[in-house]
Curated annotation (Swiss-Prot):
Superkingdom of source: Bacteria
Organism in which the protein naturally occurs: Synechocystis sp. (strain ATCC 27184 / PCC 6803 / Kazusa)
Coiled coil region boundaries: none
InterPro entries assigned: Fe-S_cluster_assembly_SufBD, SUF_FeS_clus_asmbl_SufBD_core, SUF_FeS_clus_asmbl_SufBD_sf, SUF_FeS_clus_asmbl_SufD, SufBD_N
Biological processes annotated in GO: iron-sulfur cluster assembly
NCBIfam families associated with the record: sufD
Alphabetical list of Pfam families matching this protein: SUFBD_core, SufBD_N
Name of the protein in question: Iron-sulfur cluster assembly SufBD family protein slr0076
UniProt similarity note: Belongs to the iron-sulfur cluster assembly SufBD family.
Length: 453
């Protein structure tokens, strides 16, 4: 072995040790709070044991090669504690469409005084895990922690510290007209805190529901801008659709501009089910969304629509995997990014179409609008196909505002600022127009106008 190879091996060994220590510190903080729930105790222990063989990601890892976690690793986070919050502060995040169908979690803890589920039929369960009856927890136990990637370190970190979860359980043959709002707020603290929200959604056969999942921060300044105290939001959401179930899922992330937001969303679809995700990502210094869909039976339809808007030195990374394991599946993924200043957007999307998935129709497109010469885009749409009777396509575009389009609008009387904003709003509008909740769509449109140019 040459001296150079030996030195490199020693460097990697030292680095591995450092990573293990950092993960161990996060694990210890995650497990500060205990639970007497036997179901959670068993799941926590399994994840904690698994963490012993895992490490935090590094840029040498292919799945993390464009996303540097050095800043997150350098901060000594402590487990978030319970805090009180004035109703007025939380009301800014409420959705009028879900006035009486809302669960609120502050720093990861269920807050019943800010929640309201009076509008929901008695057959529907919308509650925190700890407030469920024992027989309900037993019925849901097999869903909890089953669909996340078993070797993914951050989802295991969440499970190792799990003391509660938001739970939405829609029984068979139930169509819920009003949306359910799941609101997760972080109160910015002088000490860097780690928050680990959890969400479990079970929609049984022939049931329908719309769910809005929101993340935000309570602070004195515009929370999706920097100059806030850092915190770490580590989230796991698991969503199960029975046969012919339909779920519309609106997810919006507006964490503080100096925070870290890492989320795993795992979806399992039954026969002829329909799942639609509209994902809007605006906040956090560094955000990562691991999105996984598993087709459990045939003839499913899946739609992922996403909009990410970045400025400053923000980094946002979306990794999605759509596993089509049965025939007659249909997927459509449109991921759009608007990137300004020194920001960086990363997209890696895999669509897996094995031999069993005949007659699949899978479409994937990543479109990026770059507003600065210093902004960076890393994109990798990917199809892995072995089935021979399918209709699949994928692609990516990276563009700037077209000078001739700006000139045309200016020739119609708009100034340069308004012309550019009109084009940016139109680019974002393709996603925002799909949000079925008028109040949320309006707020996010205001954010787009505030964040661009």
């Amino acid at each position: 072995m040459t001296a150079a190879i030996l030195a490199d091996a020693l460097t990697q060994k030292v680095h591995q040790t450092e990573i293990d220590k950092e993960l161990q510190a996060l694990k210890e903080q995650a497990m500060v709070s205990g639970t007497e729930d036997s179901i959670l105790v068993n799941k926590r222990q399994g994840a904690a044991d698994l963490l012993g063989s895992l490490r935090l990601p590094h840029k040498r890892d292919e799945e993390w090669q464009f996303t540097d976690l050095s800043e997150l690793k350098a901060i000594d986070f402590v487990a978030a504690g319970k805090v009180s919050l004035d109703v007025a502060a939380a009301e800014n995040f409420y959705l009028p469409e879900a006035h009486q169908s809302r669960l609120v979690f502050i720093n990861g803890f269920f807050t019943p005084e800010l929640s309201n589920t009076n509008d929901l039929p008695s057959a529907i369960t919308c509650q925190s895990w700890t407030n469920l009856a024992a027989h309900q927890r037993e019925q849901l136990a097999n869903y909890l922690g089953q669909k996340t990637d078993g070797n993914e370190v951050f989802s295991n970190l969440n499970t190792a510290g799990m003391t509660d979860s938001a739970v939405v359980w829609i029984p068979a043959n139930t169509e819920l007209k009003s949306p359910i709002h799941l609101l997760f707020l972080t109160v910015v603290d002088p000490t860097p805190i780690m928050v680990q929200p959890r969400l479990l959604v079970v929609v049984e056969n022939n049931a329908q529901v719309t769910i809005a999942e929101s993340y935000g921060a309570i602070s004195t300044n515009c929370t999706d801008r920097p100059q806030q105290q850092p915190y770490f939001n580590n989230i796991v959401s698991e969503i199960y659709l029975g046969e012919n179930a339909q779920v519309t899922h609106i997810r919006n992330q507006r964490d503080s501009g100096d925070s870290f937001h890492i989320a795993t969303t795992a979806i399992a679809q039954g026969k002829q089910s329909r799942y639609r995700l509209i994902d809007v990502n605006l906040g956090a210094k560094l955000s990562r969304h691991n999105l996984q869909m598993t087709q459990q039976e045939e003839a499913t339809k899946t739609e992922f629509l996403a909009l990410t808007i970045l400025a400053g030195r923000q980094v946002s990374d979306t990794h999605s995997t759509i596993a089509l394991n049965h025939p007659h599946g249909a997927t459509n993924q449109l991921h759009k990014c608007i990137v300004d200043e020194y920001a960086q957007a990363v997209f890696s999307g895999k669509v897996l179409v094995p031999q069993a998935a005949q007659l699949t129709n899978a479409q994937q497109l990543n479109r990026n609008l770059v507003l600065s010469s210093k902004a960076r885009i890393n994109t990798k749409p990917e199809l892995q196909i072995t089935a021979d009777n399918v209709k699949c396509s994928h692609g990516a575009t990276i563009s700037q505002l077209e000078a001739d389009e700006v000139f045309y609008l200016r020739s119609r009387g708009l100034n340069d600022y308004d012309a550019r904003h009109l084009l940016i709003d139109a680019f974002a509008g393709e996603i925002l127009d799909q949000i079925p909740l008028a109040s949320l769509q309006g707020r996010l449109r205001q954010c787009v106008s505030c964040r661009t140019i």
